[in-house]
Amino acid sequence: MTKKLFDLQGKNVLLTGASKGMGLSMAQGLVNHGANVVISSRKLDQCQKAADAINESSGQKKAFAYSCNASSKEELQELVEFSIAELGSITTLVCNAGVNSFFGSMSEIDDESYDKTMDTNVKSNHWLINMVTPSMKESGGGSIMITSSIAAFHASETLGTYSISKLAVLGLVRNYASELGPSNI
């Protein structure tokens, strides 16, 4: 039997951007180590397919599906409420949802595309953190992780807004770490 590097039994994770790719791999890994996970993305059918596959491979119902547009504050609040109803609490928040809504020069980007990238990649994380931290503080702490990108460290002639958003995520993380660290988050 292979020894696990760590045990996540009893941990309840809300994971955005989790129906495919890196998010799906994170969800599978979290469940493999014992966590319960709410899998969220915009498309419910993809979330459900991911949750079903994870539950089948684990032999337990540890993954739950919920569709949510990460750029909608109301939908994020509903996601948090669903997660607490299904899991009992949220001990860990993993913000993995992200978009690049424009490929081209910064001088050519329209306001709508700029706002969509910043809202999804930055503002949604800010909202979610503020939605989950009160209960984390009450329970003595928690964990918050936000996916950034190497793009945060490099200028790009075609991915400028995405790069800006991922650099902003790093600032968000540093500031929340300073603010929430004393609360064991």
Residues of each region from the PLM?
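Conserved glycine-rich cofactor-binding loop
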Residues: 12, 19-21
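Conserved glycine-rich Rossmann-like NAD(P)H-binding loop of the short-chain dehydrogenase/reductase
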Residues: 33-49
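Substrate-binding pocket helix/loop in short-chain dehydrogenase/reductase
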Residues: 104-106, 110-115
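Active-site loop immediately N-terminal to the catalytic Tyr-X3-Lys motif
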Residues: 106-107, 154-160, 182-183
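Active-site helix of classical SDR
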Residues: 129, 165, 173
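Alpha-helical segment proximal to the catalytic Tyr-Lys
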Residues: 134, 178-182
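Residue(s) in the substrate-gating loop at a strand-loop-helix junction
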Residues: 149
